[in-house]
Structure formats: C-alpha cells, structure tokens
Curated annotation (Swiss-Prot):
GO terms for cellular component: CD40 receptor complex; cell surface; external side of plasma membrane; extracellular exosome; intracellular membrane-bounded organelle; neuronal cell body; plasma membrane; varicosity. CDD domains: TNFRSF5. Residues 1-20 form the signal peptide. It comes from Homo sapiens. The gene is CD40. Disulfide bonds join C26-C37, C38-C51, C41-C59, C62-C77, C83-C103, C105-C119, C111-C116, C125-C143. This is Tumor necrosis factor receptor superfamily member 5. GO terms for biological process: B cell activation; B cell mediated immunity; B cell proliferation; CD40 signaling pathway; cell surface receptor signaling pathway via JAK-STAT; cellular response to erythropoietin; cellular response to interleukin-1; cellular response to lipopolysaccharide. Glycans are attached at N153, N180.
C-alpha cells in the first residue's frame, strides 16, 4: 500500500522529462512560436526563418533605402521617407538601416504637420509690426505691433521692432517725430532755428515787394490836367481904302481852339459851352 504512491510519483517525473510542458512566456527580445522561444532580429535586420529545436532564428540586413528601427520579427523592411522638393522638403538627416530619413523644410518654409509631409512659406511681418518669435521648421512666424518708441519700416520674417533714435544722446534735436513705421528725424539746433527764421525773412521780403509794386502802380496813374485858359476872340480890322476892297459886310475872325474862325459882321460871336470849358 505504501509503494503505490511512490511509483506514481516516479512515473510522473519520467513522463515530464520525456514530454516537457511548453513555456507560457519568453524572455525579453524573444518571441514564442511553435512552443519555442525564438530570438528577435536586431534593428536593421529582417526575419528570414524562425528558430527550431535545433536552429536559431535566421535574420538578414535590410536593403538599400530600407530600415527597421526596433527588435523585430518582420519579414520586410520599411522604405525610407522621400523628401519631395516640389513640396518644399529637403533631407535633414539621411536614413540608415536602423533609422528613417528625416525631412525638413527649405529655408523660409515650415512644416504643416508634425510628420512634415509638406511645407508652407513663413509669414512676414508688415511695416509697423515686428517679429515676436522667429519661425522654425515646424512653426510659423509670430508678429506683434510695434509699441510707442519703436518702429519697423520693412516687411520681414526676421526683423524685430527697432527703438527710435535718441537725438539727445547725439546733441541733436527732434525735427520730425517717429511713428510705428518711421524713425525719429534728428538735426542740429542751428538748422532748426534756420528753418524757423528763413520763412519769416521770406515773408517780410515778399510783403516789401508787394508794397513797392503798389507804390509804382499808384505813381503811374494819370492826374487830372488843368483847364486851358479861355482866350478872348480877336477882331481883325481891314482898312476900307484898300483897292478892290469888298463893300460887303465886314467879317470878324475869332479863335476857336487856337484856330482862326471867320465871323460875319453883325452876328454875335458865341462860343459853345463845350468850347468854354
């Protein structure tokens, strides 16, 4: 009765030795297949055949432009990424059998996504705005308006707002105030004084010229002439005893406007009102 349990234990050990239990888990960098724990292929290699009771896992290196970046049991390697220049892409880091190619954007462009499958141009900050944050390969330009005391007169994706020039530090005076798009204009104090005095001098000279022209015009204006003195008519007497003298009525000769005028005797000598004046 005592020997039976002992025999059962012996038979159980024998059967276990002949038919071992399949493992339920494998170690790191191994995989379970056909009740066997086979080694994974290292990065840069692909699986050709699984291991057996008598052979190890068979792996081969990836081909040109291919890669595998982890311990694996893949039968095919992955193709390297293509950086399409038509999309603004260029190779930042060439791929190997263990790493993929890394693409980035051309200068002045940035990726539209984390995968960087295409690019767009950086934004430029217009005049009056400066660059707060310069664009990177994966982010766009960030602009900000120039505050008081600063300006930007260009459209740029790199220029920040510049401070106004300090005229005082150069012993100059401000001739024109700055804006968010223009710098302060400085100049010497003598020039500023001249800019004030010269227009005043020109104004005075212009006023004098106007007065002289007015006086000249007044001097040329004709004055009223004094009236000619009224001349009394002169009587011309002819002797009666001259031969061939005419016995007709005597004729008087007067002056009309300094010209002799014949007046018959016996008629009154009258001068028109207009002639008297």
């Amino acid at each position: 009765m005592v020997r039976l349990p002992l025999q059962c234990v012996l038979w159980g050990c024998l059967l276990t030795a002949v038919h071992p239990e399949p493992p339920t888990a494998c170690r790191e960098k191994q995989y379970l297949i056909n009740s066997q724990c086979c080694s994974l292929c290292q990065p840069g290699q692909k699986l050709v055949s699984d291991c057996t009771e008598f052979t190890e896992t068979e792996c081969l290196p990836c081909g040109e432009s291919e890669f595998l970046d982890t311990w694996n049991r893949e039968t095919h390697c992955h193709q390297h990424k293509y950086c399409d220049p038509n999309l603004g892409l260029r190779v930042q880091q060439k791929g190997t059998s263990e790493t993929d190619t890394i693409c980035t954007c051309e200068e002045g462009w940035h990726c539209t996504s984390e995968a960087c499958e295409s690019c767009v141009l950086h934004r430029s900050c217009s005049p009056g705005f400066g660059v707060k944050q310069i664009a990177t390969g994966v982010s766009d330009t960030i602009c900000e308006p120039c505050p008081v005391g600063f300006f930007s007169n260009v459209s740029s994706a790199f220029e920040k707002c510049h401070p106004w020039t300090s005229c005082e530090t150069k012993d100059l005076v401000v001739q024109q105030a700055g804006t968010n798009k223009t710098d302060v204009v400085c100049g010497p104090q003598d020039r500023l004084r001249a800019l004030v005095v010269i227009p005043i001098i020109f104004g005075i000279l212009f006023a004098i010229l106007l007065v002289l022209v007015f006086i000249k015009k007044v001097a040329k204006k004709p004055t009223n002439k004094a009236p000619h003195p009224k001349q009394e008519p002169q009587e011309i007497n002819f002797p009666d005893d001259l031969p061939g003298s005419n016995t007709a009525a005597p004729v008087q000769e007067t002056l009309h406007g300094c010209q002799p005028v014949t007046q018959e005797d016996g008629k009154e000598s009258r001068i028109s009102v207009q002639e008297r004046q």
